[in-house]
Amino acid sequence: MAVSSSNLNELVASHGSSGLIASALVDKVASEQLEEQLNHQRRGLKVYIRNRLDVKESEVIRNRYGGKYDLHLSQQEHAPHGLAGALRLCETLDCLDAFPRTGLRQDLVLDFGGSWVTHFLRGHNVHCCSPCLGVRDKMRHTERLLSMRKAIINDPQTFEGRQPNFCTNPAEKCDVQAHYAISIHGGYDMGFEGLCRAMNAHGTTFLKGTMMFDGAMLFDDSGFIPELKCHWRKIKNAFSEKENASTFTSKLNLAVSGKTLIAFDFENESTMSYIHEWKNIKSFLTDQTFSYNGYTYGIERCVIYAGILTYKIIGVPGECPPEVIRHCVWFPSLKDYVGLKIPVSADLVEWKTVRLPLSTLRDTEEIAMRCYNDKKTWQDQFKIILGVLSSKSSTIVINGMAMQAGERVDINDYPYIGFAIMLHTKMKYDKLSLMYDAWGASIISQWWKAMTKPIRTFVRLVARTLFPTLRPRSESEFLVKLSTFVTFNDECITDMGEVWDVTANAAAVAAWAVSDGKQLVAEKEKALELANQQPVQNDSQPLTTVNLSTQDPPRSVTAILDPENPVVGQAELPEPPELKALSFQTRSPDTRLAERASAMLEYVAYEQQLHQNVISNLQRIWCSAGGDFVTNRLEGNLKFVFDTYFLTDPLVNVHFPSGRWMRPVPAGTKYMVGFNEKGLGPKMDSELYIVNADCVICNSDGLSSAVKALTAPTGTISLVDGVAGCGKTTAIKKLFQPATDLIVTANKKSAQDVRMALFGASDSKEACTFVRTADSILLNDVPEVSRVLVDEVVLLHFGQLCAVMSKLKAVRAICFGDSEQIAFGSRDASFDMRRSTILPDESSTSDTTFRSPQDVVPLVTRMAGKALPRGAKSKYSRWLSQSKVLNSVSQRCIPSVALVDMDESRFYITMTQADKAALITRAKELQMPSSFYDNKIKTVHESQGISEDHVTLVRLKSTKCDLFKSFPYCLVALTRHKVSFRYEFCGELKGDLIALVLATHSPLI
């Protein structure tokens, strides 16, 4: 029960603050607050800081990020500028947290100049633009490759299939499009305007970044950031400093003459310093807006802490009203200082301003005024002032303890400061003498002086210009008031035509989010409807019609923030001629036709994206190996680079002009294309080029081009949604009519299985004519047919299915598949996939299996109940088996791959490529035939649609693997066998669905 403030006051008044009731109440409130903080910390992201930090540095990072992240300061190793490195990791995570990264839409984030290996290790969906501007950048790339290699070797399962996502292009020249971007200390070489131009090139509207910050840079030539232990210094005329004078630096000075650089040196560290152009860093302190290519970009400085500035840049389109934008750079450390001008040249023409504590100057001038005497020589006056100045900045010893009185004055400025104070004192005495003499002057003389003041002012101006050494001195030449802030006013006036309708765009963003939610709801409703349909009894039974309720996609008023526009923040680009027909069909009043055209357009964009990814990946490897885009050569260090990439891609290789390969090419592997300075394409034996796994079958560009030229089909799509082993291939065999039909499969293995079932051979001319893969149909000339029979249709993108129907001129497609098994999945996590699900005109279900034994039925039913959301319906909750095999499943724990029971009569499946590779290696060690490990060892994804008598599922790792929690993957694994299934695993894995249901399994009698 809550205690009101009045009751609390009464308790304190009656019992006192030390009373038991008051103490208990305070303890309760304190414990509740502490528990709440601990719970919040447990929910936060765990961030492990290995750098060794002292007490003050630990407090800095905890005060900045301790409330947001669960920081673990392990104090493992000494690292260069440890606090700055630890802060950089937290800054990266903090900036990424500003953008959506989970849910239906996996938004890609760009990182301008960041460390791509950080994102690779954490699995971030981030593309890094990391140009090689010099040897330092190449050293960093090599170091990051080493870190990636080390991580993969230590934990190959975690990084299986994960590729680093970066390019070596400057940010302005990279064509990867994304809504959001970060720049963690990456803006030093680009400046504010450079970042804005990079954002415009990428279609980015929101950037969040960090940089080192010290307001004193605006008026000082050097300074110190105490939290980071970083000294900064402006270097004019490049390397003109005496301590840096050398032949090399003099040459460099000529190359960058006229530029003012700024160097950041970390205290007591011999690591390489950071040197950048001052104008780029200054732009983040002084600039406010920048208009470029139809957009106005504004910078907002968010947080300044521990010498780190966090800022954000937002781009807005269209016309902006005139506005004066004001911001300040504050210098709180200057409130106790005053500026004193001291002479630099002997003729007293050149002066400079130095900072001096206000108390020191006040006390020194006070004593100087009291001790001033006209009869003394200037040297005696000077010594008195120097003595006072020295006492105000000296070290004194009291009872054996050394104490600093004031601040020490720079040894080079010390005599000139005393000399300037002496001149200032003399000027004041002379001015007071004139005032005293004027006190007794007559009215006429005062009138004459007032009348001739303009003349005297003119004479002084002429004398000051012609004879600078004769100009009179004024008070302002000695003392300068130091402001505690600097104000910058930027008048933002842009006229770019169309006015940006903020309200309409806000509605578009809302519609965008609502459409995501509706899509999720529609998918759930569709799954429920399909599950409630009657099963298919025979081929002649009419298929149940499903009324699809769809609605037109929301359209935005402008192209900005348009939910249907994949590049948010860019003006709508003109469509190529090939897409005009499909684009026109997307606006058709026929909802079904519009859906199919939109799906085909998405499939075109998806294949184009995959093609660009292949080019980007190969270009990254080419540049990492020292290649350029002018000559056909690679620099040294090839073995290290390709050994590192070989850990994630065993097909990465180098072909030399002599015809040899760096690594032996696996038997049966033939590369379609390669990559070198000419780009991606077919290569000759006399060329130097590189390849990876994507070069074996590289047809994405051809598929996108083929689909562009087609239009959406108007034929009928029927779907038979059946459980595993319900006889889909048998139904295709019964329905097939050579005169009117063509059989389409999703992959080559399924095509071979269907050919064997229908024609008894997988490579005969007749079998290859009537059974084709979807890719083969789109890439080659095919005859027109009236009906298409599609096997494992869930592995196809809906747009690809529509393209196949369009090219074959088919009026009907009868599709077979299982909507609850592994469906089509995007190979690019950053691609916004929305229209891959098959939308049939007619749908029916089949819930009887002829393949799976009797004991598999309750296991799968139990597995569906545990994995699927509460209330979700599934075909497998009421499926039946016609198999005569009663008991088929078993399991056993094994310590390593060496004890896996390898038998040529069994079919082996794994969830991961790493486990598959380990089994293949084991089979080679046992000298088993190549036909066995080439055809009898597959991943679960590769084995979908396959039927075998004896199946063994192998898991060799107990580390986290989400595939064992996925119902579609576990369903495929448990329904491939006809006679026996054995699960062999190493160690316990939390959340393993198959192990969970097998643990409660009892044999059927």
From Swiss-Prot:
Compartments reported by the entry: Host endoplasmic reticulum membrane
Residue span, Alphavirus-like MT domain: 72-285
EC annotation from Swiss-Prot or TrEMBL: 3.6.4.-, 2.1.1.-
Official protein name in the record: Replication protein 1a
Keyword vocabulary terms for this entry: ATP-binding, Helicase, Host endoplasmic reticulum, Host membrane, Hydrolase, Membrane, Methyltransferase, Nucleotide-binding, Transferase
Entry keyword annotation includes Transferase: yes
A Gene Ontology BP annotation from the UniProt entry: mRNA modification
(+)RNA virus helicase C-terminal domain ranges (all copies): 847-1005
Subunit structure: Interacts with RNA-directed RNA polymerase 2a.
Function statement: Involved in the virus replication. Contains a helicase domain and a methyltransferase domain. The methyltransferase domain is probably involved in viral RNA capping. Involved in the formation of ER membrane spherular invaginations in which RNA replication complexes form.
UniProt cross-references to PROSITE patterns, sorted A to Z: ALPHAVIRUS_MT, PSRV_HELICASE
Residue ranges constituting the (+)RNA virus helicase ATP-binding domain according to the UniProt record: 695-846
Keyword Metal-binding assigned: no
Coarse class of the protein's main subcellular location: host cell
Protein family membership: Belongs to the bromoviridae replication protein 1a family.
GO cellular component, as recorded: host cell endoplasmic reticulum membrane; membrane
Chain intervals for the UniProt region annotation (Methyltransferase): 51-404
GO MF: ATP binding; helicase activity; hydrolase activity, acting on acid anhydrides; mRNA methyltransferase activity; RNA binding
Spans annotated as ATP-dependent helicase: 719-983
Gene3D superfamilies for the chain: P-loop containing nucleotide triphosphate hydrolases
